[in-house]
């Protein structure tokens, strides 16, 4: 899980807040990035 977050955070951190990194990862897993 840490490896996935570490890979996603730098990329999505630009458009999304790092604080919601976990939520973003969950959305990406479902294929839904509506928040971004």
Curated annotation (Swiss-Prot):
Residues 1-10, 19-36 form a propeptide. GO terms for molecular function: toxin activity. Processed by the macrocyclase-peptidase enzyme POPB to yield a toxic cyclic decapeptide. POPB first removes 10 residues from the N-terminus. Conformational trapping of the remaining peptide forces the enzyme to release this intermediate rather than proceed to macrocyclization. The enzyme rebinds the remaining peptide in a different conformation and catalyzes macrocyclization of the N-terminal 8 residues. The keyword Ribosomal protein does not apply. There is a cross-link at residues 12-16 (2'-cysteinyl-6'-hydroxytryptophan sulfoxide (Trp-Cys)). Keywords: Thioether bond, Toxin. The typical symptoms of amatoxin poisoning are gastro-intestinal distress beginning 6-12 hours after ingestion, a remission phase lasting 12-24 hours, and progressive loss of liver function culminating in death within 3-5 days. One of the few effective treatments is liver transplantation. Toxin belonging to the bicyclic octapeptides amatoxins that acts by binding non-competitively to RNA polymerase II and greatly slowing the elongation of transcripts from target promoters. The keyword Signal does not apply. There is a cross-link at residues 11-18 (Cyclopeptide (Ile-Pro)). InterPro entries: Amanitin/phalloidin. Transmembrane segments: none annotated. It comes from the Eukaryota. This is Beta-amanitin proprotein. Belongs to the MSDIN fungal toxin family.
